[in-house]
Amino acid sequence: MNRICIVGRITRDPYNNITNSGISYSRFTIAVDRRNFSSQRSENITDYIPVVAWRGLSEFIKKNVFKGTLVSVEGSLQSYIRSEDKNTSYEVNIENFSILESRQIIEERKSKIQGNHSMNSSFLENNINYNALKEYKNHNTNNIQNQNSYSNEKSQSQTSFLDDEQTSESNEKWDLESDWD
């Protein structure tokens, strides 16, 4: 079974593009810490893992994910040979994707990056779950008109709210266009 699960931060804004056949994709790198048990001290080592998202998930990422965003990714490891140097490279093909911090935190980080300083305040931590497999099944990927009408469709993402260590039992469906613009 080829299954990868990683949690980390986006190292820079995702690169978004469209293939020659009209399929949108996003590529980015996630910084993930792991312990180095070979040294005398238990030090953290940061790995940089390249990932790729396709179709509807790519559109979601393009609008909502920025440098520094804390995310969870599930997918499969795939290899390919780079044409320029004939070396084998690896990346994670995303199947499930979650943003692990609130919109408020993301907006504060964006403001600081742009030179604006906004005040810190308490927040509810939102987990925005986005299942790429469901999105893939619900879209006709060969029809560009369906890609353009994406903004009118309801997302199948669910949000659970966390307050410190207590989990709220309410899950809500979100319309990604209206809630994240």
From Swiss-Prot:
GO function term, MF aspect, one: single-stranded DNA binding
Q: Give the compositionally biased regions (Low complexity).
A: 142-152
Cellular component (GO) terms are: nucleoid
Concerning Gene3D superfamilies, the annotation shows: Nucleic acid-binding proteins (2.40.50.140)
Query: Where is the region Disordered?
Result: 142-181
**Where do the SSB domain residues begin and end?**
1-101
Segments traversing the membrane: none
Q: Where is the signal peptide?
A: none
Q: Which InterPro entries match?
A: NA-bd_OB-fold (IPR012340), Primosome_PriB/ssb (IPR000424), ssDNA-bd (IPR011344)
Compositional bias ranges of the Basic and acidic residues kind = 170-181
Q: What cystine linkages occur within this chain?
A: none
**UniProt keyword terms in alphabetical order:** DNA-binding
Q: Which GO terms describe its biological process?
A: DNA replication
**Could you give the subunit structure recorded for this chain?**
Homotetramer.
Name recorded for this polypeptide = Single-stranded DNA-binding protein
Q: Which organism is it from?
A: Mycoplasmopsis pulmonis (strain UAB CTIP)
